[in-house]
Amino acid sequence: MAAILAERGWRVIDVDLVGHRVLREPEARELVAGRFGPGVLSADGEVDRKELSRRVFRSREELAALEGIVHPRMVERVREELAVTPEPAVLNAAVLFRMGLDRLCSAVLCVRAPWWVRLARARRRDGLALAQGLRRIAAQRGICPKLHAAGVDIYYINNGSGVDALREGTLRLLREKGLEL
C-alpha cells in the first residue's frame, strides 16, 4: 500500500523504520537492555532486533513493556518528520491506532488480508518460523478498530488477492473519496 501511494506522489513515513532508528538511540537502547537483559544486544552494542522480537512476541506483557519504551519515542520522531514540511504524508504503521498515531491523520486506509495470507507473507519476508509468525499475527489482532470507534475516517482495502488487486482497489478508493494528490 505505501509503495502504491508513494508512486502517486505521497511522502511516506515508514513507522517501522522509525522504530529501528529509535532502537539505535542510546537512551532507548539502554532501557531495552535493562528491561530484557544484555542478551538483546549484539557484540557491537546495538539492539539485536531478531533476538528482541523472539523474546517480546512470547507474551503480551513483554510486548507491552517494549512498546512502553519505544512507542512514545517513535510518536515523537513521527511528529518531527511531519513538521519538516506541510506536504501530505502517509504513515505506514501496522499498529497506528495502538500508538495513537491516528490522532495525527485525516484519514486511515486500513489494509486487510486473511490471517493465513499475512502469515505466509511474514514468513516469506522475514524468514520466520511458523510459531514466530503466528505469535506476530496474534499480537496484531484488533489493530484496525471498528469504524465508529475511531476519531478519524477509516477506509478498508482488501489485500488478499495480490498487488494488482490492491493497486486497483487503492486507486479506486482514492478517486472515490477525493484523497488523490
Question: PLM features: residue spans?
Answer:
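Well-ordered beta-strand positions
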Residues: 11, 17, 107, 153-155
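Short histidine/acidic/glycine/proline-rich micro-motifs that form metal-
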Residues: 17-20, 96, 161-163
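ATP-dependent NMP and nucleoside kinases share a basic, alpha-helical "lid"
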Residues: 76-83, 89-124
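A conserved segment at the C-terminal end of the G1
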Residues: 1-13
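Short, acidic/turn-prone active-site loops that include or flank metal/cofactor-
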Residues: 17-20, 113-116, 136-139
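ATP-dependent small-molecule kinase phosphotransfer cores
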Residues: 17-86
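Small-molecule kinase domains that catalyze NTP-dependent phosphoryl transfer to phosphate-bearing small molecules
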Residues: 77, 103-104, 124-176, 180-181
